[in-house]
């Protein structure tokens, strides 16, 4: 499950609280029933109270579609990037409210697939976990490439900039192209 880099997994279900707690414990989402709350208990909370308590709960049981939207919005108000998965018409409003809505491709309804930002073709949660990991690797690689290019080319940029200010030519365009070819191509192969 996505536990690295402060990813929080939350289970929101229409199932009975005891069932949801048992599944949550089995999956390692929660350690005890105090981390679960029901839709009826959510009704008693104002939006401000929910905002204060949303991080305390990882399992939400017996919830209605409007509860799911409230939960997603509470996480968003906390500054979290939210992703919501679902397959039924009742999941569509919360999938639409989330930053990233994920519909199920096999069991999902057409409504859910249409409002989703992404459709999971195999209905497998592990695919989402793998995609998040791959996305993080791509992001890290892009960041490293930009750092390398800035670091390796900064001397060229500064040299040409100050030479231009002082009124003389430090490097011709052909020289710059040759330097870039040598310094940027070989490290790119690694």
Show the residue positions of the predicted features.
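Short, small-residue-biased leader/transition segments that mark boundaries at the very start
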Residues: 1-6
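Short active-site oxyanion
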Residues: 7-10, 57-59
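Residue-level "edge-of-site" marker
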Residues: 14-17, 37, 88, 108
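Acidic, divalent-metal-coordinating active-site segment for phosphoryl/phosphodiester hydrolysis
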Residues: 16-27, 66-71, 88-98
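Membrane-embedded transport module
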Residues: 31-83, 98, 103-190
